[in-house]
Amino acid sequence: YVAISRYNLALYALSKVTDENYPLKGVRTGEVKFLRGATYFFMKTLWRYIPWVDEENGRTVEDVTNISNRPNGTDDTYLWEHIVADLEEAVRLLPEKQEEIGRINKNAARAMAAKALLFMAYKQDARHQVVEVDKKILERALVYINEITDQEGGNVGLCEDFAENFLPEYDNATKEAIWEIQYSINDGTSSGGNTNNGAELNAPSWEPYFPCCDFHKMSFNMANAFRTGT
């Protein structure tokens, strides 16, 4: 919600300027809508019922405190509708290409909107079992998917070698990547770079080189599955 607060502040600030005073208003609004929609998407898939706070209903601490994660006992459909609305607005506002590497473009928004719609289409009960598939929502997702795949051979396509997606020499250069988060290393900052902290936490504990955190531990079931007999 720290991230959500920042998006909401940005959207509120953007609403106070005109296109004449700030020609990039529409593009920047689309970028922030994408980020907010994507962040809420990941929150939604983790916790299902979450409070929806935006630039209109969450202006004060009191406002936020009064927001329920299930207004009037509703199901979670309204959350998907908000998430998809943000992402579809991003599709409308963003350009096909951005001048600066790492900025979100229309294809990134199309892909994220399609992903959210695919999740939304599969209705689940209280035990997270799929009980219904909404074909109309799947058709909405297919529109965005087709808009991307129709560019095959041009802006998008599969790499001859799948490994190219992960090798540094192909950074921001493969047609298979829809959008890439930008990381850096040894960039002159005090932290040593804008790195993926989550990935760093997976390294085995190895003082003094890796003091933390060895997260990639197998489960007991996995260990037992490969336990040798005596």
Language-model segments: residues:
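An aromatic- and glycine-enriched ligand-binding surface/loop that stacks and positions planar moieties
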Residues: 1, 50, 80, 88-89, ...
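Conserved, well-structured interaction surfaces
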Residues: 1-47, 68-81, 86-101
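Short, well-structured active-site flanking segments
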Residues: 44-56
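Flexible, glycine-rich phosphate/dinucleotide-binding loops
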Residues: 46, 61, 123
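Short linear capping/connector segments at secondary-structure termini
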Residues: 55-67
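Short, flexible loop/turn elements at secondary-structure junctions
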Residues: 56-59, 98, 162, 183-185
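Second-shell loop/turn segments in exported
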Residues: 65-74, 128-133
